[in-house]
Design a protein with these regions (language model features):
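Extracytoplasmic beta-rich repeat domains
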Residues: 232-245, 273-294, 320-335, 375-404, ...
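Blade/loop signatures of beta-propeller domains
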Residues: 161-229, 376-383, 525-531, 597-598, ...
């Protein structure tokens, strides 16, 4: 077996040893260095760590006691070396050493270290934060973990020329440029959202049931080899996992940086572009995954915790509602859904300790007015409020809603997955694995009219390894009976009765060693004992890793074959909990990780498998070295389309798994493929991008011979050759 390549980011810690016989001194820096570093930080770091350094998602706070404690008496050269190897995530090592030193100087200033006349350098004995109580300087001892043991210019063919005049719409936080009138767009009714026309893709997974299935059948198993490129559109650089929407041949696609574009689906011409403008000192940039539409509006949940309605024909802002305070870390990573005239959105960025926990909101689709708010953290004195140990409300972190939900129009229920409690590991959050922490790691069934939780199913109570169950809820009727299928990072496929949430079955899809007991009759799981008894600073080796199992790359359902097609990831990790301070504004993920190959897979990190919805049996599986980084798109032509880290897009026979066609893109295929039709001609659209979270990192960390070039985000559109 090849030796696993191990890389570390700001959140990663390894065991440490003491460097003795060396006089420690606080690193110095100049004011000029800090000023340059501030500008570099805003350009390269603020999208993840935020302008105020408080951090978001997996990016830690860089100006709190946890950061200072972590780097106390650790050498400046060690810190700069780590930055050079891992930052910025989309292009590690892209800055020169002096620029990394400038950023380090800015971080010192932000942590109340005063500037001096002496510039920051890599001199021996100079430590990032001097702490006389912490002992001698520490250096990292790299350990070999053992699984299972404790311890843009338009592309040719898109826009023909830059228009001389564009109509400009300016709002308080956005500017829209409209180049062409979108006259052929027809309003999208409630009835069409419930049952979309075959030619359109009006939900993030086409239908409100989140099946990712297109009923178009012009492209088949017999002719898919004749697919050719129709056009390409170059997208904004940055972390990108977009899910386009299509109506009447108009593509609406989210970009990094809170940019939304409308494209002509036949030619690739840009029709209008909405670009978010962020106030000074606030969040900038950020990932957008999904959009929603209703009537003549397109809805965007922005990374500064706003919900925005755009005019579908012009891109002009119709309304803009703040749903949370971005200064507290709140954000949106995925978009809302619309259910019968109500826009329903889940908030994320809830890792910090504040009383205002995560929630799901319902809004009037026409005005943006908030109709209801349902918290995903059970409050003291309410049902489930006693499942958080003795923690007061302000220290109940997590339960983010970071993926988009589903809607059953007949039952009039919406379904959302809720992520894990935070910090990731139970001992870090002052709890045990027996503290369920409702409603984290659950599927929620919600009445869209008032936000009432009709039922919930907590898949892994007391989840303690950042293996959340926050992903797609696929709604399937089997012989007239309504079911819900969902799968999380543990790789367990869950089957529920969607009327009640009652457990109906499960299937393990990848190797796992975190649960010592899985009750096949009830679905109850129990962690192995060393996980239940974890201690701060001790390492646990677990499978799968936080990449999954399964992650954001959504399942596709193929009704004719009754198969669920699931993108899976095969890797393991070693993980260690940190100690945190229980102070308002503290918190975060507070766990350290190293990734490694999964035993028995021959270092094939990507898996695509089909599961029969009746028996839950695996029908076929494909394993390869490159991780799969798109959702699965299934079609009535008997095909499943999917893309991977190694830049390939594949078309497989949905019933056998036989590969029938593939092509290669400029960078990793990443996001949510869609299919649509214009004048009876079927198209397949595949996004490319980088920085898909843990699933993308598996390729960059463990398969270094596979390359994912930077700055090639795009939308590739294919059709049959004439």
């Amino acid at each position: 077996m090849k030796t696993a390549l191990k890389l570390w980011s700001l959140t990663f810690l390894l065991s440490s040893t003491v460097l003795s016989g060396q006089e420690l001194k606080q690193a110095s820096f100049s004011a000029d260095q800090a000023a340059r570093g501030s500008e570099l930080y805003q350009q390269n770091c603020a999208a993840c760590h935020l302008a105020n350094l408080t951090g978001s998602f997996e990016a830690p706070n860089l100006a709190d006691t946890g950061f200072r404690s972590n780097w106390a008496n650790r050498r400046v050269d060690e810190f700069v070396d780590m930055l050079q190897r891992t930052m910025p995530p989309q292009a590690p090592g892209s800055l020169d050493q002096s620029q990394y030193l400038d950023i380090s100087a800015f971080l010192l200033e932000a942590n109340n270290i005063s500037a001096s006349a002496t510039a920051l350098s890599l001199s021996a004995g100079s430590v990032l934060f001097l702490d006389n109580k912490a002992g001698a300087a520490r250096v990292l001892e790299r350990r070999t973990p053992v699984p299972g043991l404790a311890g843009t210019v338009p592309s040719p063919g898109t826009r023909n020329s830059v228009p001389e005049i564009a109509t400009i719409y300016q709002s308080e936080r956005a500017r829209t440029r409209s180049f062409e009138s979108v006259n052929k767009f027809r309003n999208v009714s409630n009835e069409e959202l419930a049952n979309p026309p075959a030619a359109d893709w009006t939900y993030w997974r086409r239908s409100p049931q989140s099946q990712g299935y297109s009923p178009l059948d012009q492209i088949t198993t017999d002719n898919v080899g004749q697919l050719s490129l129709a056009w390409v559109w170059g997208m904004e650089p940055g972390r990108s996992q977009p899910a386009p929407l299509v109506r009447d041949g108009i593509i609406f696609i989210p970009n990094f940086g809170n940019v939304v574009q409308a494209l002509d689906g036949r030619s690739g011409n840009l029709l209008w572009e909405y670009r978010r403008q962020f106030p000074e000192g606030g969040r900038s940039g950020g990932l957008l995954r999904t959009l929603a539409m209703w009537e003549d509006l397109v809805y965007v949940a922005t990374t500064d915790a706003h919900l925005v309605a755009l005019d579908a024909r012009s891109g002009a802002v119709r309304w803009d509602s703040e749903i949370a305070d971005e200064a507290l870390g709140y954000s949106n990573t995925s978009g809302p859904i619309v259910a019968d005239g109500i826009v329903i959105n889940g908030i994320s960025g809830c890792g910090r300790f504040f009383e205002q926990s995560c929630f799901i909101t319902g809004h009037d689709a026409a005005t943006g007015a908030e109709l209801w708010r349902t918290y995903t953290v059970a409050r003291p004195g309410e049902p489930g409020g006693d499942t958080w140990g003795d923690l007061p409300l302000e220290f109940r972190g997590g339960a983010d809603v970071w993926m988009t939900g589903s809607w059953d129009p007949e039952m009039d229920l919406v379904f959302f997955g809720v992520a894990q409690a935070k910090p990731w590991m139970s001992v870090s959050r002052g709890m045990s694995a027996d503290d369920a922490a409702l409603y984290s790691n659950s599927t929620l069934a919600i009445d869209p009219s008032d936000g009432r939780i009709v039922w919930y199913r907590q898949h892994v109570p007391g989840e303690s390894l950042d293996m959340d169950e926050a992903f797609e809820q696929v709604l399937v009727d089997i012989v007239g009976e309504p079911y819900l299928f969902t799968i999380g990072k543990s790789g367990i496929l869950w089957k529920l009765d969607r009327r009640s949430g009652e457990f109906q079955g499960l299937r393990e899809t990848t190797y796992q060693n975190v649960f010592s007991d899985i009750n096949l009759e009830t679905g109850e799981v129990r962690y192995r004992e060393d996980i239940r008894n974890m201690q701060v600073g001790e390492w646990l080796s677990v499978c799968p890793s936080t990449a999954g199992g399964h992650n954001w790359q959504s399942t596709g359902y193929h009704p004719p074959s009754r198969n669920l097609i699931i993108p899976l990831s095969q890797s393991c990790m070693e993980m260690s909990p940190r100690e945190i301070e229980f102070e308002v504004g503290s918190g975060g993920n507070q766990g350290d990780r190293q990734w490694m190959p999964m035993p028995g897979t021959e270092e094939r990190f990507g898996k695509l498998a089909a599961y029969d919805v009746d028996s839950m049996e695996e029908e076929w599986a494909i394993q390869q070295r490159a991780p799969f980084l798109t959702a699965a798109l299934t079609t009535a032509g008997g095909l499943v389309f999917i893309g991977d880290y190694d830049r390939y897009v594949h078309a497989y026979d949905v019933e056998t798994g036989q590969e029938l066609w593939r092509t290669r893109l400029a960078t990793s295929a990443q996001g949510f493929p869609v299919s649509f039709a214009i004048d009876g001609e079927q198209y397949i659209a595949i996004p490319s991008g980088r920085e898909g979270g843990s699933p993308w990192r598996i390729g960059s960390f463990l398969a270094p011979e596979l390359q994912s070039p930077n700055n090639h985000n795009a939308l590739y559109v294919f059709k049959l050759s004439p």
